[in-house]
Amino acid sequence: KEAKVDVTVYDHGVGQATKAAAGIISPWFSKRRNKAWYRLARLGADFYQELVEDLAKDGINTDFYQQTGVYLLKNNEEKLEELYQLALSRRKESPLIGDLAILTKEEVAQQFPGLQGFEKLLYASGGAHVEGALLTETLLKASGARVIREEVALTVTDTGYQIAGENYDQVILATGAWLGQILEPLGYQVDVRPQKGQLRDYQLDLDTDDYPVVMPEGELDIIPFQQGKISMGATHENEMGFDLMVDQALLNQMETEALTYYPELAQAEVIGERVGTRAYTSDFSPFWGALPDRAGLYVASGLGSSGLTTGPLIGWHLAQLVVGGNLRLDPADYPVEQYVKK
């Protein structure tokens, strides 16, 4: 926006993982050994503070981001101490973590009445949640970009690129699990596969505005939003391709598990389900940057289930590459050529 770049966004929107997501921003407890990934996730969490501040300065509503803290539950509660120490050691470079504490049932009951299924849990006040659909809508509106909501293809021309009959000097392909469908016709092999994710939304007659996110072990998360809305999910289905059908049986199974932690959900009204398609690479690492043999073509994919944590920061970096700005991360740590090959 500041660099006076003329931007057009093509967004088909069908199956988009971000829109279907209730994202948890809390990367500090991850035990992934991939240092480049952790740096991206840590700075991605920090970046929300900047993003929210910038939007607020422009008078734009930032309700998509709520910092209400997170609860981490472990089947073996001895592991909580280990995770507490890990987060404590990371707090120096990530003060956003905020207050860290191992809480008892009694202490939790004051913050999140009715939560059960544990003796102790780990709490970090800096954890946040993001409403994916609202985030995408807010960013598109704030960007002032022209938005064309249709499925398009990319053609290489002598002078640059063509999309839907219009010519462009530079193109960013942030097309998630669909990256291969755009690049394969141009002769590339793309190491990105789809993963289906589903979640269910509930409405409770309760004030849930300040409830922390609940993260038990496994796939289940319970994510309270404002005014009694609670999301539960999400599934991680690797064999379903780009399927977008709601699987009630699978969500009912997850709900049964959720009820062991939060029986109150039995009183809630189900207000909808969401389905989206995440993008994964074969080694679960994201990649972003310029396509080595094509000037002016930039890509990003493979963000997986941490996409709401890392996505905005990757988007900022791609914009910096387009306008020749300074970067905070080294693109060599997220090498495009490892996943997109001729």
Question: What are these model-predicted stretches?
Answer:
Residues 1-3, 12, 23-24, 61-64, ...:
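Active-site substrate-recognition segment that forms the wall
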